[in-house]
Amino acid sequence: MSELCVGINGFGRIGRLVLRACLQKGIKVTAINDPFIDLQYMVYMFKYDSTHGRYKGEVHMEDGKLIVDGQAISVFQCMKPAEIPWGDAGALYVVESTGVFLSIEKASAHIQGGAKRVVVSAPSPDAPMFVMGVNQDKYDPSSMTIVSNASCTTNCLAPLAKVIHDNFGIEEALMTTVHAYTATQKTVDGPSAKAWRDGRGAHQNIIPASTGAAKAVGKVIPELNGKLTGMAFRVPVADVSVVDLTCRLTRPASYANIKESVKKAAHGPMKGILGYTEDSVVSSDFVGDTHSSIFDAGAGISLNDNFVKLISWYDNEFGYSHRVADLLMYMHSKE
């Protein structure tokens, strides 16, 4: 099998952290495209990060390329995905992290530039959606060239929902994510014609917002389709979010039973995806955590044996970026 070589389109928060995740996992990144960031600025942006700290390796530019730890990465500034020469750079897998080319039709433009497969780092309106640890076995290389890694919140919620549903059955559930603010929000009040609340100052407010993350769980766990929905509160922290899953169980279970089932999964089949803690943690304790979801055993509550509130943390930037890298490796292993 040929080596996994990756290209990244869009060098924003996720693009940069996917590069960090790939470097940590030994995945070769051969090209980056971003029409709005020149090479010199790219070096600076990758080297310094206010949330995750300075990159600990060596970063510089040489002969028109980005050099990270001695690895040369071609840099392009194409506006149109079809014009990016992925093939020339040897990047057969592309991470689409601009947030713009989300549909199969739009993301397929990368194939014209020589890419073989595309992973969209966001929910897609029509591409098959995969959550590592939950439904990656449904990936079919013969028919799927464009896939979605879902959202950071779906990646937190789905593994927990799977464990609970497999062990006790979920009759119905509501999710709330208390979510860190992101780059789409405003530093001070500004225009947001489609969703008025989203235009309010991110660090000044708790902002109710919509999210498709809970409904998307129904796409990766079909038995839960129509049984789950949810909403978000955007809060004034820069990173790390937390899911509150309140569910009615089919089969009664004590909170101790639930903890034991989650712990078993976290130390077994979902190791590295689902974490488990009994410590008295707060959000900043999870900055840089690479799990999709870390179950907080001490924060959940049970009203009775059929009605429970479960709490799970996630680094919405870094945990998610590691799953993008894991999905790339999984897909490559199926070639």
Swiss-Prot record:
<dbReference type="GO" id="GO:0006006">
    <property type="term" value="P:glucose metabolic process"/>
</dbReference>
<keyword id="KW-0324">Glycolysis</keyword>
<feature type="binding site">
    <location>
        <position position="79"/>
    </location>
    <ligand>
        <name>NAD(+)</name>
    </ligand>
</feature>
<comment type="function">
    <text>Glyceraldehyde-3-phosphate dehydrogenase is a key enzyme in glycolysis that catalyzes the first step of the pathway by converting D-glyceraldehyde 3-phosphate (G3P) into 3-phospho-D-glyceroyl phosphate.</text>
</comment>
<feature type="binding site">
    <location>
        <begin position="13"/>
        <end position="14"/>
    </location>
    <ligand>
        <name>NAD(+)</name>
    </ligand>
</feature>
<dbReference type="GO" id="GO:0005829">
    <property type="term" value="C:cytosol"/>
</dbReference>
<keyword id="KW-0520">NAD</keyword>
<feature type="binding site">
    <location>
        <begin position="211"/>
        <end position="212"/>
    </location>
    <ligand>
        <name>D-glyceraldehyde 3-phosphate</name>
    </ligand>
</feature>
<dbReference type="GO" id="GO:0006096">
    <property type="term" value="P:glycolytic process"/>
</dbReference>
<feature type="binding site">
    <location>
        <position position="234"/>
    </location>
    <ligand>
        <name>D-glyceraldehyde 3-phosphate</name>
    </ligand>
</feature>
<feature type="binding site">
    <location>
        <position position="182"/>
    </location>
    <ligand>
        <name>D-glyceraldehyde 3-phosphate</name>
    </ligand>
</feature>
<dbReference type="GO" id="GO:0004365">
    <property type="term" value="F:glyceraldehyde-3-phosphate dehydrogenase (NAD+) (phosphorylating) activity"/>
</dbReference>
<dbReference type="Pfam" id="PF02800">
    <property type="entry name" value="Gp_dh_C"/>
</dbReference>
<dbReference type="GO" id="GO:0050661">
    <property type="term" value="F:NADP binding"/>
</dbReference>
<dbReference type="InterPro" id="IPR006424">
    <property type="entry name" value="Glyceraldehyde-3-P_DH_1"/>
</dbReference>
<feature type="active site" description="Nucleophile">
    <location>
        <position position="152"/>
    </location>
</feature>
<keyword id="KW-0560">Oxidoreductase</keyword>
<dbReference type="InterPro" id="IPR020830">
    <property type="entry name" value="GlycerAld_3-P_DH_AS"/>
</dbReference>
<feature type="binding site">
    <location>
        <position position="34"/>
    </location>
    <ligand>
        <name>NAD(+)</name>
    </ligand>
</feature>
<dbReference type="Pfam" id="PF00044">
    <property type="entry name" value="Gp_dh_N"/>
</dbReference>
<keyword id="KW-0963">Cytoplasm</keyword>
<comment type="pathway">
    <text>Carbohydrate degradation; glycolysis; pyruvate from D-glyceraldehyde 3-phosphate: step 1/5.</text>
</comment>
<comment type="subunit">
    <text>Homotetramer.</text>
</comment>
<comment type="similarity">
    <text>Belongs to the glyceraldehyde-3-phosphate dehydrogenase family.</text>
</comment>
<dbReference type="InterPro" id="IPR020828">
    <property type="entry name" value="GlycerAld_3-P_DH_NAD(P)-bd"/>
</dbReference>
<dbReference type="GO" id="GO:0051287">
    <property type="term" value="F:NAD binding"/>
</dbReference>
<dbReference type="InterPro" id="IPR020831">
    <property type="entry name" value="GlycerAld/Erythrose_P_DH"/>
</dbReference>
<feature type="binding site">
    <location>
        <begin position="151"/>
        <end position="153"/>
    </location>
    <ligand>
        <name>D-glyceraldehyde 3-phosphate</name>
    </ligand>
</feature>
<protein>
    <recommendedName>
        <fullName>Glyceraldehyde-3-phosphate dehydrogenase 2</fullName>
        <ecNumber>1.2.1.12</ecNumber>
    </recommendedName>
</protein>
<dbReference type="InterPro" id="IPR036291">
    <property type="entry name" value="NAD(P)-bd_dom_sf"/>
</dbReference>
<dbReference type="InterPro" id="IPR020829">
    <property type="entry name" value="GlycerAld_3-P_DH_cat"/>
</dbReference>
<feature type="site" description="Activates thiol group during catalysis">
    <location>
        <position position="179"/>
    </location>
</feature>
<feature type="binding site">
    <location>
        <position position="316"/>
    </location>
    <ligand>
        <name>NAD(+)</name>
    </ligand>
</feature>
